[in-house]
Design a protein with these regions (language model features):
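Short acidic, glycine-rich surface-loop motifs adjacent to enzyme active sites
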Residues: 46-60, 145-146, 221-242, 270, ...
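Catalytic domains of carbohydrate-active enzymes, especially glycoside hydrolases
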Residues: 44-58, 120-134
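Preference for extracellular/luminal or secreted protein segments
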Residues: 4-46, 258, 280-528
């Protein structure tokens, strides 16, 4: 369905607009964070006093969440839109669910058919749990291996591929009835600063930005993405004042809306992030972003009431025209109309919610993606199928397998090496070294470079087949020539461990390709 193509029902939205006060309208622009930790009564107060437009779900248990949403929606005169940052599906906020692969693993797939299916399956899950908006996918081009915040959230380092794969995921989710948001405009891939902590700078000229950062966003717009999320970035070529992109009129209104032709909803990245919240008093940030052209103001810093009041005051004082306010509120109401939220109070059935969401079809699809994305970087000297295969050697004891502990120490690595000593081949599974907050040292008593050095030395003493259950950038840190074989499984979840096991046992072939250039190997490489 084309964005905002809702037949004759627009009359209802116009009637609502005419009846709404400035306070009613401004409240619809704000989406506030909710989690199991949210104090009782806090959201109720914001619904009653500030008339907020929606919530973003952080973390909760599914049945508790469903009951809370049902109770809260009953109190909202205009039903709230429920949103989520669910880049790898509902499991990102409801951790009892099986996790969909991250975008970089999807980027290892050879075509987009399966990516569309992933989008549809994600949408089915979101709709079952009453989520209307997913702030995904990331269409940033991750062409900087040192990027601390995007990494596996990107489809890769090729803008054309990122655009193509992002469009497939968007199509799948939107066809499934869920609003999606291409992010982080104008592009967060080639940065070495996390915008949660500071303001990153993109120092490139306009020609480079058009060819790399902006390309996937333009393609998403051409493919009718319904929402674009603006990130917190300093882009001098687009706005020489140094204003963060989320507060920049030249970037949001002149570039995104006018030049690139985006007619949908512009949503901010979280406005409490330090990439923007330290730029001015926190309660002034939402107002500045709205003046710049944003439509929906996501997760302002804790001064929620003051933030909303400041926008109301600006409208009443004439700093913001009533027409400008109506323009954004109209978009929000039309979105709610398309979602059926204006037809009555929504209800999330808590009964069998887990069983309905974690279906066999979803689990099978996730395994199918994991199987299809395994990437052979260096084919082992031993055959993977037939007589004398690696699987036969493992059964006879001539080859042994070991899974390294995430909380690695020199002692644990020495122990792992000793456990396979004497074997002709050692199959070593290297887990993710990524901690929840991107603190690479949290899982280990050793620095990553020490771990990679140990493994490279080990490979010089024994035929080591390395299964990298992490992103491909590990290839930049190891001596590829030292290893007898290298395969990439992208993460340590059970489905990926199983998929790599299938490849090494000869049950399936490795069909994935490198989604990024790494280890001196090009994007799209696979060892056939």
């Amino acid at each position: 369905m084309p964005m905002f193509a809702f037949g004759q029902k627009q009359d209802r939205v116009e009637r609502m607009l005419r009846k709404m006060s400035v306070r009613d309208k401004v409240g619809q622009l704000f989406i506030i964070n909710y989690g199991h930790y949210t104090p009782e009564g806090q959201i109720e107060e914001m619904i009653k006093k500030d008339r907020i437009g929606g919530l973003i779900i952080m973390e909760d248990e599914m049945v508790h969440y469903a009951n809370r949403m049902n109770a809260l929606q009953k109190q909202s005169r205009i039903p709230m839109v429920i949103s989520i940052d669910g880049e790898w599906g509902a499991s990102m906020r409801f951790d009892t669910l099986t996790q969909f692969p991250r975008n970089m693993q999807l980027g290892a797939l050879s075509n987009t058919d399966m990516i569309y299916k992933v989008g549809r399956a994600m949408a089915d899950q979101f709709r079952r749990v009453g989520v209307h908006i997913n702030y995904a996918p990331t269409v940033d081009v991750n062409n900087n291996p040192k990027n601390p915040v995007i990494g596996q959230r990107s489809f890769g380092d090729n803008p054309q591929k990122v655009a193509k794969y992002g469009a497939a995921l968007i199509r799948g989710m939107q066809d499934g009835g869920v609003w999606t948001s291409a992010k982080h405009f104008p592009g967060h891939g080639d940065t070495d600063v996390d915008s949660h902590k500071a303001l990153p700078t993109l120092p490139f000229d306009r020609a480079r930005l058009d060819a790399m950062e902006l390309y996937p966003f333009q393609e998403a717009i051409n493919q009718d993405v319904w929402m674009v999320m603006v990130g917190h970035l300093n882009v001098p070529a687009l706005d020489p004042t140094g204003m963060p992109s989320s507060l920049s009129y030249p970037i949001i209104t002149k570039l995104l809306k006018e030049e690139m032709g985006f007619k949908g909803i512009v949503v901010t990245d979280a406005l409490g992030m330090k990439g923007v919240s330290t730029y001015m008093p926190a309660e002034m940030v939402p107002l500045a972003s709205f003046k710049a052209g944003s439509d929906v103001l996501l997760m302002p810093a804790q001064s929620w009431h003051r933030s909303i009041k400041n926008v109301i005051k600006a409208v009443k004082k004439g700093e913001i025209s009533r027409e400008r306010l109506d323009e954004s509120v109209r978009k929000v109401l039309k979105m709610k109309e398309q979602l059926g939220l204006l037809d009555g109070t929504p209800f999330i059935d808590p009964e069998n919610i887990y069983e309905d969401t974690e279906t066999k079809e979803v689990v099978d699809l996730i395994q199918e993606v994991c199987d299809a994305s395994v990437t052979m970087v260096k084919r082992p000297s031993v055959a993977l199928k037939g007589e004398g295969s690696l699987n036969e050697l493992i059964k006879s004891g001539r080859a042994k397998e070991v899974v390294l502990d995430k909380r690695m120490s020199l002692a644990s690595l020495d122990g792992a090496k000793a456990s396979v000593a004497g074997a002709e081949y050692a199959v070593v599974y290297l887990p993710e070294l990524r901690a929840p907050k991107n603190d690479f040292n949290s899982y280990s008593n050793m620095k990553p470079e020490e771990i990679y050095g140990f493994l490279s030395d080990w490979a010089g003493q024994q035929k080591v087949i390395l299964a990298i259950m992490n992103n491909p950038y590990v290839l930049d840190q190891i001596d590829l020539k030292a290893f007898d074989g290298i395969v990439i499984g992208y993460s340590s979840v059970d489905q990926n461990m199983k998929a790599v096991g299938k490849v090494l046992s000869g049950e399936i072939d490795a069909e994935g390709v490198l989604p990024v250039s790494a280890g001196g190997l090009p994007n799209g490489f696979s060892a056939k």
